[in-house]
C-alpha cells in the first residue's frame, strides 16, 4: 500500500478536504512528509488516525467520531423506488453498524458494496469465500477486485464482523442498490463538501421520460456517480452508446459493476473504456455526444488552483464566484453534436438569479430550450 495524500486520506475517512487541511493546520493529524506542497501519510499513521477516531481516544477528533455515527448512517430511501425489496435488509445492516460503532472508511464501505454486488451476480452471501478465492463471478472478478482493494485487509474485517456479511440481497432491475449502500454509508458532510447529492430514482426516470429514446444516439452522464441515470436508460440503448465519468473513484467502480449487471454479456474492457474516472471539466476529451444527461454538482467548493484553470477556459468561471453546474452546462454544450440534447437536473436559481446571467446568455446563444419541468423540492 503506497502512502496516501491528504486528499486520499480524506476520501478514506469520508471527510472533506477542507476539514483535512484544517486538521493538519491545527495539529490534529501530522503528515509524515510534504511533497510539492502536498501532505502525505503512511499506512501505520493512517491506522492510528482511524483507531483514534473509532475509540474517541483523541479528544480533538472525538467530535468527528460522534458526527459520523449520528449523521453518517442514514438510509437514503428516496434514492430508490418505494417498492425496493432491499431497503429492509440495508436498514438492518446500518443498524448493526451503528450498534457496533464501526468507523465507515471508504474501504469498509467498499466491502459492504462488494458483498451485495457478489450476490446480485447470482452468488449467495459468500463474500469471505470469494476473498479466499474459492468462488468467482468469472470475467467480472476484476471489477469486484478493484472495489475491494487489499483482500487480506478485507478478510480481516470479515472475520472480525461476520454478521455484516450474512445479509441476503436480491437483484432488482432498475434499482441501484449498490449506489444506495454507498450513499447511505457515506458521511453527509463529505457529500456537502463535494457538492454532490445523489438523485432520487423518480427524478431520474422523469428526466429520461422526456428524451427521444429512438434518437438518443451516443449518451453521456458527465457526473455519473454510481451510474443511476445510465441504469435507468431503456434496454434498447446499447452499452456501445453509453458513457459516464466522475471524479469519485469508488463511485466509478460501482458504476462499472452496475453496467456489468445491466449488460451481462458486456466485455470488461468496453465497460472500463466507457465508464471512467476523470474530471469532466478539465480531463474528459471525448466529444460528439448526441445526448448528455445528469445532475451536475451544485455549489462545489473549487480550490484556488481549480478556479484559475477554469477561469482560463470557461466564460462561466470568469466571475468572482464559480458555480459548478454553470461550468458543467457550458462544457456539455461544447461536446454535443449539432441538434444534440442536453437534459440536466438544475436548481431554479439558474433561471432568474443574477449570478447565472452568463450561462443563460450562453444557452440563448448556443441552444434552444425545448422544455422546463419543475421537479419539486
Regions found by a protein language model. Give the residues of each.
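Polyanion-binding surface elements
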Residues: 1-23
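Signature of N6-adenine DNA methyltransferases within the class I
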Residues: 3, 13-14, 28, 32-44, ...
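Mixed-charge intrinsically disordered linker/loop segments at interdomain junctions
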Residues: 22-25, 52
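Short, basic amphipathic alpha-helical segments that act as recognition/interaction helices
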Residues: 30, 48-52, 275
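A short, Lys/Arg-enriched interface patch at domain edges and termini
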Residues: 44-78
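Class I S-adenosyl-L-methionine
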Residues: 75-261, 279, 352, 359
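S-adenosyl-L-methionine
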Residues: 256-283
Amino acid at each position: 500500500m503506497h502512502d496516501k495524500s491528504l486528499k486520499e486520506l480524506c476520501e478514506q475517512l469520508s471527510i472533506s478536504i477542507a476539514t483535512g487541511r484544517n486538521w493538519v493546520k491545527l495539529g490534529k493529524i501530522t503528515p509524515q512528509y510534504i511533497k510539492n506542497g502536498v501532505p502525505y501519510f503512511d499506512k501505520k499513521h493512517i491506522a492510528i488516525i482511524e483507531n483514534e477516531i473509532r475509540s474517541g481516544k483523541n479528544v480533538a477528533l472525538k467530535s468527528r467520531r460522534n458526527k459520523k455515527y449520528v449523521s453518517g448512517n442514514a438510509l437514503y430511501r428516496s434514492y430508490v423506488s418505494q417498492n425496493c425489496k432491499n431497503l429492509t435488509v440495508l436498514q438492518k445492516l446500518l443498524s448493526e453498524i451503528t450498534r457496533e460503532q464501526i468507523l465507515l472508511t471508504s474501504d469498509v464501505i467498499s466491502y459492504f458494496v462488494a458483498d451485495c454486488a457478489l450476490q446480485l451476480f447470482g452468488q449467495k452471501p459468500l463474500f469471505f469465500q470469494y476473498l479466499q478465492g474459492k468462488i468467482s463471478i468469472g470475467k467480472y472478478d476484476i471489477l469486484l477486485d478493484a472495489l475491494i482493494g487489499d483482500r487480506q485487509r478485507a478478510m480481516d474485517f470479515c472475520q472480525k464482523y461476520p454478521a455484516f456479511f450474512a445479509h441476503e440481497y436480491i437483484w432488482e432491475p432498475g434499482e441501484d442498490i449498490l449506489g444506495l449502500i454507498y450513499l447511505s454509508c457515506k458521511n453527509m458532510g463529505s457529500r456537502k463538501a463535494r457538492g454532490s447529492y445523489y438523485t432520487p430514482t423518480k427524478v431520474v426516470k422523469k428526466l429520461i421520460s422526456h428524451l427521444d429514446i429512438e434518437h438518443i444516439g451516443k449518451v453521456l452522464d458527465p457526473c455519473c456517480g454510481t451510474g443511476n441515470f445510465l441504469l435507468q436508460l431503456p434496454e434498447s440503448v446499447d452499452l456501445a452508446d453509453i458513457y459516464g465519468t466522475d471524479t469519485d473513484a469508488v463511485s466509478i467502480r460501482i458504476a462499472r459493476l452496475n453496467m456489468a449487471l445491466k449488460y451481462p454479456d458486456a466485455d470488461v474492457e468496453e465497460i472500463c473504456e466507457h465508464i471512467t474516472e476523470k474530471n469532466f471539466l478539465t480531463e474528459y476529451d471525448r466529444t460528439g455526444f448526441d445526448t448528455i444527461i445528469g445532475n451536475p454538482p451544485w455549489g462545489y467548493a473549487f480550490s484556488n488552483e481549480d478556479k484559475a484553470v477554469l477561469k482560463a477556459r470557461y466564460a462561466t468561471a470568469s466571475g468572482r464566484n464559480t458555480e459548478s453546474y454553470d461550468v458543467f452546462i457550458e462544457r456539455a454544450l461544447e461536446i454535443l453534436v449539432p441538434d444534440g440534447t442536453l437534459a440536466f437536473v438544475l436548481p431554479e436559481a439558474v433561471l432568474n438569479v443574477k449570478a447565472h446571467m452568463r450561462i443563460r446568455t450562453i444557452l440563448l446563444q448556443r441552444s434552444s430550450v425545448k422544455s422546463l419541468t419543475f421537479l419539486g423540492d
